[in-house]
């Protein structure tokens, strides 16, 4: 937790929670053990601290400014923007029991989300796909549309969820593309997602290790 969160009633997303030294030590120890480090980071100060500490990816990055976007691009730090979760929470949060104070924070920070994401695209920050929501099934499919609305092409959004996610996790030897020798894990949709990315919300079937596990019903 490089910063506080948004959809909780207590913490402040603008405040750096761990010190620079604590983050650097956590990253050092994790990397020594061969693990990746992802930092929850909303506010600008915490984002920059996490980048300096050497994390592999920034989760959310909602207040990414020009300087931090440049830092990420220069250091090869990934961004997992989770665009849809904030948009969804603002629509459903109160009905799910979110505190009014949390909703107020969400309304404030969602205004930062679009400009921050466009800065990441401007500086060619590496972007991988991810979600962060109570309604995980919906978020997984609708994040594609949010990425495209945010400025990505449909192809870039698909790559974020496939080869780029695999590269971030150093799993691209086995995952991320369809080619001989890799795991046969993929989904099928009714039409070409390059023409309409929202078809990713309508999966026809899922294949896992070469076996169809979710046929069209």
Question: Regions from the language model: what does each represent?
Answer:
Residues 32-36, 97-100, 109-192:
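His/Asp/Glu-enriched, well-ordered alpha-helical/loop segment
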Residues 206:
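Short aromatic-centered micro-motifs
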Residues 27, 47, 69, 117-118, ...:
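Short glycine-/small-residue-rich flexible loop motifs, especially phosphate/cofactor-binding loops
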Residues 2-111, 128, 134-135, 167-169, ...:
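Active-site core of metal-dependent hydrolases
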Residues 195:
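Small/polar (Gly/Ser/Thr/Ala-rich) solvent-exposed segments
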């Amino acid at each position: 937790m490089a910063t506080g969160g948004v959809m909780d009633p207590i913490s402040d997303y603008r405040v750096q929670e761990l010190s620079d030294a604590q983050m650097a030590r956590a990253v050092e120890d994790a990397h020594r053990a061969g693990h990746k480090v992802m930092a929850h980071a909303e506010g600008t100060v915490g984002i920059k601290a996490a980048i300096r500490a050497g994390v592999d990816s920034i989760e959310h990055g909602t207040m990414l400014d020009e300087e931090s976007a440049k830092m990420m691009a220069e250091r090869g730090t990934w961004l997992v923007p989770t665009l849809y979760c904030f948009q969804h929470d603002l629509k459903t949060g109160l009905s799910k029991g979110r505190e009014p104070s949390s909703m107020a924070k969400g309304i404030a920070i969602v205004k930062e989300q679009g400009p921050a994401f466009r800065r990441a695209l401007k500086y060619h920050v590496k972007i991988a796909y991810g979600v962060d929501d109570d309604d995980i099934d919906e978020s997984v499919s609708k994040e594609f549309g949010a990425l495209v609305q945010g400025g990505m092409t449909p192809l870039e959004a698909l790559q974020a969820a496939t080869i780029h996610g695999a590269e971030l996790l150093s799993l691209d030897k086995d995952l991320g593309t369809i080619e001989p020798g890799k795991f046969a894990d993929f989904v099928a949709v009714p039409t070409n997602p390059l023409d309409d990315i929202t078809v990713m919300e309508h999966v026809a079937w899922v294949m896992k290790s070469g076996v169809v596990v979710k046929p069209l019903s």
